[in-house]
Amino acid sequence: MSNLDPMRPRVSVVIPAFNVEGYLGAAIDSVLAQTLADVEVVVVDDGSTDATVAVARGYGDARVRVFENVRNQGPARSRNVAIDQARGEWIAILDADDWWKEDRLERLLALAEAHGADIVCDDLLLVPEGAPGPESTLFTVHAQRLGRIDKPFEVDALKMAEDDFGILKPLFRREFLDERGLRYNPAFRAGEDFELLLRCLLASARMVVSHEAMYFYRARRGSLVASPVQCLSQILEMTDALIRDVDAKTHGEIVQALEGYRRRKRDELGDARFREPLHAGRWGECVSLAVKNPAMLLRYAAVLGERFLPLGLLLVLVT
């Protein structure tokens, strides 16, 4: 039962915000419209140069609390500031350009109580940039890898490392985070979600994921980092740090899974390094990268061949 105590809300919703004047209102509105009324919103502005702060302060609602970083410090540090200021029993993560279904908190807290969970998440409704609504869900897009998901399931550290659920937006039991001194690692501007979730699981957190999709995830270019190359480079640094820190003797399977995760991200980085000049029309750079990497050449030969060289000549360059 909700106590509606403003000094001890059931849920504190953490929103780091940077230059999101056109999106932040929808995020906050979706929290204030929740069927669970016992909430507060903690917005931390990360050095915005637009009207983001004005949007947040414009609510004039005691449930919406606004803090400002003196300079841009990244989403991890901003979330930590918000968590430290939060007063709720649960900490919910919401990105400033996303929003929720109105009963998301009520459903996820019921799931947490039913399973005795320390962390609960749900599927994501994927909204492409510029689209009016979702076109798919995360679990649907990855159905070949994840299989059919039609009921809640638990995620342990090994499953997190193998299947990469780091993109999910969790609710954390505040007591669990505080007792174990766990926060986001501010050294990373990408991959920090995966890193914290894995460290929580290594600290014996119980994580349950709903098969329902109640979080609208907007795929917006430039929302966190400058480019996919920069993002993936940060994720690789984060993964290297985890592999160094995790005890291979105690958690050998997890280290092996992290090494596999690192290999996949390295492949993605190679592709991203090719796609950036491809999308920018820097064709000479594309050809140079393709010549150095025959596998990449075969994947993108049709594009390069139409624009630049016959496929046969491209193949000659690498044989």
Regions found by a protein language model. Give the residues of each.
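Nucleotide-sugar donor-binding/catalytic module of glycosyltransferases
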Residues: M1-S233, G312-L315
